């Protein structure tokens, strides 16, 4: 027994010595220096359970991203170190660090950490929860779906825009909660684009008869359970590796209802021949394109749930905050309306190409995504001992050694408020800041590197089309809430806590 103990102790000593030597070699080679440490403000933070105890409050008040931004300012750094129960997390808004971590050359040095644990009940091994060969396979399958020729199918949005306009006209001149309508529009168009048939939530809002072939109770349950799932998924993200603690029956029910909804459409395509798939009138639909590559039900379900999760809320968030800002900046609204009237005299003139050429519209969209990023932060976990290029030493410009298992969280919310990147008054909504010909490489609303969003053109095109059509139809927009800047909340994406209360006239 004594000999076994000595043998095991010897192995540990050798391992620790080798680990120490390797780390010292990295420190010497890259001239690494320690980062500034952010002190814990309470014993809950030190124990690492503040995010658990205050999870609901942080979600409702958007506390996490504003708390991070406040620490950057109080420490006067772009990268700081946080220690909780001996576990280290580096938090950065330095774009050089972010681009380094997300680059292709660093893919083997970083992994998704606890993200797969948080997402797996909902999207299984879909593209947002997979790594390595599984992720590469997902990306190869999905890339053709988001090719420009499919994104250009903008006329397929018009029926849902017509329903949106009808709802607004029913409340013309009255306060209207636009955030809800933005989510109804995007869930309708997303299900049409992904599955080939809309869930008709806008028609339900209007009290009109649905054209869906689905059972009414299943269709209604799908739309209502979607928001509940996202709220609970946010808490799972905050719990990290303890996400398994957040798995109540209500969460399981919400997920199952959404999978049952998607499975109806999967059942249909699994039974279709290759000829039927190729000749289908909606050949651009994601499900049909995936079914040409595989009939594996699990793969189809995981990828559909992944894209549905990402596609629906990103566009809804962008539309919500764009119209919120336009309602509080009448001079921007008036200028944008003039530009739209000049570029788009009628519905037929709205094409993928003309949308791209309307500069002021694109400036407004960029400024909205800068000020209100739909995903305000992201993170990676070191797969082995590695180095990030900046943030260490007294000058905060030296490299930092990151040990295996340590996490780096990067705040796009804070990056987008850096004056050295985006000019003065970065808390102000100012589309004209995008008029400079210099390309802002620091602006990465859809991430960067190999894992950059495949469908990043889609929310831009959707938001552009809806904005054009609404400004073609209505001549004025007023805010029905004086709260500015707004209270924001992070669910799957950033949202307005009190909704987007506006008046169209």
Swiss-Prot record:
What's this protein's name? Cytochrome P450 52C1
What's the EC number here? 1.14.14.-
A Pfam family of the record is p450
Under the heading SUPFAM superfamilies, the entry gives: Cytochrome P450 (SSF48264)
Q: What GO molecular function annotations does the UniProt record carry, in alphabetical order?
A: heme binding; iron ion binding; oxidoreductase activity, acting on paired donors, with incorporation or reduction of molecular oxygen, reduced flavin or flavoprotein as one donor, and incorporation of one atom of oxygen
Topology versus the membrane: Single-pass membrane protein
Gene3D superfamilies from the entry?
A: Cytochrome P450
Q: Source species, please?
A: Candida tropicalis (Yeast)
Q: Where does heme bind?
A: 453
Q: Which UniProt keywords apply?
A: Heme, Iron, Membrane, Metal-binding, Monooxygenase, Oxidoreductase, Transmembrane, Transmembrane helix
């Amino acid at each position: 027994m004594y000999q076994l103990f000595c043998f095991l102790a010897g192995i540990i000593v050798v391992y620790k010595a080798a680990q120490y030597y390797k780390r010292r070699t990295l420190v010497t080679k890259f001239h690494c220096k320690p980062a500034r440490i952010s002190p814990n403000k309470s014993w809950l933070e030190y124990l690492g359970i503040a995010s658990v105890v205050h999870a609901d409050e942080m979600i409702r008040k958007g506390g996490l991203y504003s708390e991070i931004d406040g620490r950057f300012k109080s420490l006067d750094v772009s990268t700081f170190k946080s220690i909780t129960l001996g576990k280290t997390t580096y938090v950065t808004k330095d774009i050089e660090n972010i681009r380094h971590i997300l680059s292709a050359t660093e893919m083997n040095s970083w992994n998704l950490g606890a993200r797969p644990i948080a997402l797996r009940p909902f999207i299984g091994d879909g593209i947002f929860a997979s790594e390595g060969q599984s992720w590469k396979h997902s990306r190869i399958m999905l890339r053709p779906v988001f090719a420009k020729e499919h994104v250009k199918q903008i006329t397929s949005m018009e029926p849902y825009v017509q329903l949106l306009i009808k709802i607004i006209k029913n409340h013309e001149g009255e306060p209207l909660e636009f955030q809800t309508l933005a989510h109804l529009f995007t869930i309708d168009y997303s299900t049409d684009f992904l599955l080939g048939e809309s869930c008709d939530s806008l028609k339900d809002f209007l009290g009109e008869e649905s054209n869906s072939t689905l059972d009414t109770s299943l269709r209604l349950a799908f739309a209502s359970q979607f928001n509940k799932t996202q709220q609970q998924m946010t808490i799972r993200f905050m719990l990290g590796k303890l996400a398994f603690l957040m798995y109540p029956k209500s969460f399981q029910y919400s997920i199952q209802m959404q999978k049952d909804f998607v499975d109806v459409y999967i059942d249909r395509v699994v039974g279709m021949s290759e000829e039927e798939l190729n000749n289908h009138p909606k050949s651009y639909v994601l499900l049909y394109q995936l079914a040409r590559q595989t009939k594996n039900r699990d793969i189809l379900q995981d990828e559909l749930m992944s894209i549905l999760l990402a596609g629906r809320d990103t566009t809804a968030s962008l539309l919500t905050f764009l119209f919120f800002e336009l309602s509080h900046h009448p001079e921007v609204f008036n200028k944008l309306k003039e530009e739209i009237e000049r570029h788009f005299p009628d519905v037929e003139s709205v094409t993928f190409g003309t949308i791209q050429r309307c500069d002021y519209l694109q400036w407004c969209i960029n400024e909205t995504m800068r000020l209100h990023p739909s995903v305000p932060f992201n993170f990676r976990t070191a797969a082995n001992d590695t180095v990030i290029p900046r943030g260490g030493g007294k000058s905060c410009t030296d490299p930092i050694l990151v040990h295996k298992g340590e996490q780096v969280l990067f705040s796009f919310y804070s990056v987008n408020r850096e004056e050295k990147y985006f000019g003065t008054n970065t808390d102000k909504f100012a589309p004209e800041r995008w008029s400079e010909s210099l390309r802002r490489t620091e602006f990465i609303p859809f991430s960067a590197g190999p894992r950059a969003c495949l469908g990043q053109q889609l929310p831009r095109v959707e938001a552009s089309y809806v904005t054009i059509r609404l400004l073609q139809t209505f001549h004025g927009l007023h805010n029905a809430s004086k709260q500015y800047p707004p209270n924001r909340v992070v669910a799957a994406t950033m949202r307005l806590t009190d909704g987007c209360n506006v008046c169209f006239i």
